[in-house]
Amino acid sequence: GRKAKQSSAFKAALEYFETGIALLKDDPWNVQYELCRNLHTEATEAAYLNGDFATMDKYYPIVLKNTRNLLEKVKPYEIRILAYKAENKLLDAIKTGLELLKQLGEDFPSNPTMVHVMVDLIKTKVKLSGKNNDKLKDLPAMTDETKMAAMRIMADIASSSYWATPTLFPLVIFRMVHLSLRYGNTAISAFAFATYGVIMCGVLGQMRNGYEFGKLGLILLEKYNAKEWK
């Protein structure tokens, strides 16, 4: 099934995974947990990639209900978010992402205003004060799995928030910068710092600052070989 998925044969992959699910023993979530979880998660993703959202929605809640820890829920949540984006249901994508982020310890205001944006902007500028690109590019690599998952989910909802809830968008970017400063850089930090630079240029008119953060984003892209963000 995974080989078929890697070959973009998503329909065949889904059939393989569903066959695997059908062959599981009785009470599989207890007696074959890892295999059962992997098959259901893979079936959820293969259905999404095949554009079969009805089948995806059959497996998605089963995975969420039966997974044993929060980090195991991240992948199915991501699939659901990406599916909402594919269906142009941006508010649903954002709602789903915020729901998981809260569980991951990253809460956001339900109705963000420009006051929230200005407060977080000031906090971000304070955290960045005295730190040039040389210091920022050499931050240690992020190792906290919960924060790494939060970074992925924030990246997943960033574009949706840009179009559907514009006051949330900068809050998401600022939070990604905060996490990078506190817990270290990931490939996604390249996106965070570069987009922060866009905000500096496009919103605040701070062209030199914005340009420097854009350069930092490119440096981190190369450092982490972040092909998905190029």
Where do the language-model regions lie?
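Tandem amphipathic alpha-helical repeat scaffolds
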Residues: G1-Q6, N38-L49, K75-A86, M118-K127, ...
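Amphipathic alpha-helical segments of tetratricopeptide repeats
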Residues: R2, E18-P28, Y60-K65, L98-P109, ...
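Primarily a tetratricopeptide repeat
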Residues: S8, E15, A54, K58, ...
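Short, charge-rich amphipathic alpha-helical segments embedded
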Residues: S8-H40, K65-Y77, L101-H116, R182-A192
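TPR-repeat structural position
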Residues: F10, F53, L70, L90, ...
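Residues that mark the junctions of alpha-helical repeat units in TPR/alpha-solenoid scaffolds
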Residues: Q32-C36, K73, T146, A150, ...
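Compositionally biased, long intrinsically disordered regions
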Residues: L49, T55-I62, L70-L104, F169
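Amphipathic helix-loop-helix modules that constitute alpha-helical solenoid scaffolds
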Residues: K85-F174, G202-E212
